[in-house]
Swiss-Prot record:
Its main location: secreted. Transmembrane segments: none annotated. Binds to sodium channels (Nav) and inhibits the inactivation of the activated channels, thereby blocking neuronal transmission. It comes from Olivierus martensii. This is Neurotoxin BmK 18(2). One of its GO terms (cellular component) is extracellular region. GO terms for molecular function: sodium channel inhibitor activity; toxin activity. It is found in: Secreted. InterPro entries: LCN-type_CS_alpha_beta_dom, Scorpion_toxinL/defensin. Has the structural arrangement of an alpha-helix connected to antiparallel beta-sheets by disulfide bonds (CS-alpha/beta).
Length: 20
């Protein structure tokens, strides 16, 4: 279940970083 949480967190970071 931790993998999913990390995956979602990473997704936001990747998207947010690219959006910035």
């Amino acid at each position: 279940v931790r993998d999913a949480y990390i995956a979602e967190d990473y997704d936001c970071v990747y998207h947010c970083a690219r959006d910035a």
